[in-house]
Amino acid sequence: MKEEASQPSPTELFTEYLIRRKHRKTPERYAILEKIYSVDGHFNAEGLYELMQNDYRVSLATVYNTLDILLDAALIVKHQFDGQPAQYEKALGSTMHNHSVCTVCGRIKEFTDKKIYQAIQAKEFANFKSTHYSLYVYGVCKKCQKKKKQINSNI
């Protein structure tokens, strides 16, 4: 029976990237990577900075610079939701998913849809090979719909 090779960890991939690009392997960069891969869901730079202060003090500039490096290394994904500050999420170990974004409160909810995924996978692009996709659906969440209904009924 053939043993499957295990996937390299985010830390191993990051180390390879830093060596390949001749970047310094600083403890701050590794601490930021570790924090990102220890939390679930989306985060922004300022929120990550706040999280880092509990364990490993880094400057906000270091957070932003490291996010740029992690983006280039394909270890995180950046989302820009309708005028909000950039949101990030880890790229490894997460399933392909879509996002519904409330235009009233800004709440972001992830969802999966097999039909959308299959349609993207089946699509053949001329001179292009897709590696991943992002789909954002904008609208009003149930909570905000309910609030609006209550306000309208009180008028």
Map each language-model feature to its residues:
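Short coil turns linking two alpha-helices in DNA-binding domains
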Residues: 59-60
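Short helix-capping/hinge SLiMs at alpha-helix to coil transitions
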Residues: 23, 37-40, 54
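Basic amphipathic alpha-helical segments that dock to polyanions
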Residues: 63-73
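Short acidic, hydrophobic short linear motifs in intrinsically disordered regions
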Residues: 43-50
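Short alpha-helical segments that sit at the start of domains
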Residues: 4-33
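Non-DNA-binding regulatory cores of transcription-related proteins
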Residues: 73-155
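Short amphipathic alpha-helical elements of helix-turn-helix/winged-helix folds
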Residues: 17, 34-39, 73
